[in-house]
Amino acid sequence: MSAKSKGNPSSSSAAEGPPAASKTKVKEQIKIIVEDLELVLGDLKDVAKELKEVVDQIDTLTSDLQLEDEMTDSSKTDTLNSSSSGTTASSIEKIKEQANAPLIKPPAHPSAILTVLRKPNPPPPPPRLTPVRCEEPQRVVPTANPVKTNGTLLRNGGLAGRPNKIPNGDICCIPNSNLDKAPLQSLMHRPEKDRSPQAGPRERVRFNEKVQYHGYCPDCESRYNIKNREVHLHSEPVHPPGKIPHQGPLLHPPPHLPNFPLENGGLGISHSNSFPPPTPATVPPPAAPKPQKTILRKSTTTTV
């Protein structure tokens, strides 16, 4: 370009045209940019107007909350003075904070309701003292008034003095002659010895279906059917020492059985030395020969 301009002076005038054209193009582009900026400013003004409308709607909605006058005035001045997007955003945040602040403060009416609800509530100590007073007589009653029995107490509360039903349904028959002279014992010794024997050698106790023991008394001489199973009969008479055996079969006391509980909490027969046995004078002599005692056991033995 420089070589051509030096050789031909006419070409230099032609070369000065392109810079002038470029300047005009730049000016046109600047005008276009300014117009675009004006459009953007117009859009921003529209957005500001919309934000003001939103703020007015918020004020109308929050007017029912009875806001303080100072806070409402400050919010209005902030919204009117905001002219740019940054100021409008800050004013919106302030309005949100001011709208949330009065909600945290409790109004006057709910506080009055709370005070009314607190007054009728009774103090906690009185209801705690009432059960303690009720428990004291319950602890004193069993120790102060011991119940006298004949030494044969069942765990379910029944007495063996009169015909009583054992929990499994059988009836325990004991003659009344042995009850008057039997040793008396109170309930206070029961916790020490949980196993209480039954007085009287003649009694009938029926256990669960696996093991059955039948002792016959003078009033009950019937026999039970053991559901067609094998039965072992023990019919050997036992004579106490120092007595002459009678011609007819004599009664013998039931064998010593271990103490074991029934299914529903009762106690089995136990002839231990924990309770003194009744005196021999209290037992009336048999008037007539009676059938010999038999012990019926099933072939299937169980450990309790």
UniProtKB/Swiss-Prot annotation:
The species this protein was found in: Mus musculus (Mouse)
Disulfides per UniProt: none
Biased composition (Pro residues): 120-129, 275-289
Highest rank taxon of the organism: Eukaryota
Further details from the record: Overexpression causes embryonic lethality. Conditional overexpression leads to increased cell size.
Pfam family, one: DUF4589
InterPro entries: Largen/INSYN1
One annotated GO biological process: positive regulation of cell size
Protein name in UniProt: Protein Largen
Function (record text): Regulator of cell size that promotes cell size increase independently of mTOR and Hippo signaling pathways. Acts by stimulating the translation of specific mRNAs, including those encoding proteins affecting mitochondrial functions. Increases mitochondrial mass and respiration.
Keywords: Coiled coil
Secretion signal span: none
Low complexity bias locations: 1-22, 77-91
